[in-house]
């Protein structure tokens, strides 16, 4: 075979290794413990905008370690992180791959504003310090009331591409886009943020919802949307809900696309420039 060589240059792969070490050192210095969550589990998420990869007879490759990390927190684990693979069906392109590296961490006692500062601190360590701007979702796409969700998603994606150069935190998402974030006191927006750097979406964080009944209701809404879109039905993760009923402590969490950050550090144009091999 002639295509045995890695996709990325050896220099990019060495740089990637250095960035992985720096990220781990940053979190260790703040007493955030590294955990390892299985990549394959019986259940996955119900979120209609994210599709899981099924492994027949075994379950699903995990789109994120979120549910199992929150189970650890409910069991008494202190602030923790995972830096490892995540998987999503149907994602392929310059900025997407079915398998990618995700850095996800949870901070006990934090809200989303405190976590935004920590995300900025980490990015400054890896990418060099620069100023950040804060915009609301409405600043980015305009009024959302009465607009179809698919139209809003397209408008948001296009608007993010235009946020360049620079670093932008986007906050105050509409309540119906809360995912698993809590709702702000205004009742109209969610305690959720996204980080966009030079037009690329990098991280997505929440002040975490704690109420098990509200989670179940949101999962029910997800299932209804899945049915309307003709998507596969996804069973609710009852072990996750049981952990919430036991009690998830006050916390905020964020998921960061590590490959994209490596891309930005190395001046690369595509994920294939900073990953050794592509599995599919």
What spans do the regions from the language model cover?
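TRNA-binding/sensing appendages of the translation machinery
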Residues: 1-51, 256
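Short glycine-/small-residue-rich flexible loop motifs, especially phosphate/cofactor-binding loops
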Residues: 24-25, 69, 138
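Short secondary-structure capping/junction motifs at helix and strand boundaries
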Residues: 32-35, 78-83, 129-130
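A conserved active-site cap/scaffold subdomain adjacent to cofactor or substrate pockets
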Residues: 95-146
């Amino acid at each position: 075979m002639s295509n045995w060589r890695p996709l990325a240059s050896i220099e990019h792969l060495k740089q990637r290794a250095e960035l992985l070490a720096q990220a781990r050192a940053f979190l260790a210095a703040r007493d955030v413990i590294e955990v390892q969550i299985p990549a394959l589990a019986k259940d996955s998420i119900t979120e209609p905008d994210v599709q899981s990869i099924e492994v027949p007879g075994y379950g699903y490759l995990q789109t994120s370690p979120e549910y199992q990390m929150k189970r650890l927190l409910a069991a008494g684990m202190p602030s923790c992180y995972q830096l490892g693979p995540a998987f999503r069906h149907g994602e392929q392109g310059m900025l997407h791959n079915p398998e990618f590296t995700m850095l996800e961490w949870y901070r006990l006692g934090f809200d989303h504003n405190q976590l935004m500062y920590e995300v900025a601190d980490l990015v400054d360590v890896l990418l060099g310090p620069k100023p950040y701007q804060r915009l609301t979702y409405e600043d980015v796409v305009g009024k959302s009331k009465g607009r179809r969700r698919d139209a809003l998603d397209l408008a948001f994606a296009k608007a993010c591409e235009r946020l360049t150069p620079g670093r932008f935190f986007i906050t105050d998402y509409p309540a119906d886009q809360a995912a698993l974030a809590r709702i702000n006191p205004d009742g109209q927006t969610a305690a959720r943020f996204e980080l966009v750097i030079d037009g690329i979406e990098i991280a997505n964080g929440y002040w975490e919802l704690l109420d098990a009944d509200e989670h179940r209701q949101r999962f029910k809404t997800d299932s209804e949307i899945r049915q309307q879109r003709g998507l596969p039905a996804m069973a609710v993760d009852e072990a996750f809900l049981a952990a919430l009923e036991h009690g998830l402590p006050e916390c905020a969490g964020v998921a960061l696309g590590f490959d994209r950050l490596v891309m930005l550090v190395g001046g690369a144009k595509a994920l294939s420039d900073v990953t050794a091999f592509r599995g599919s």
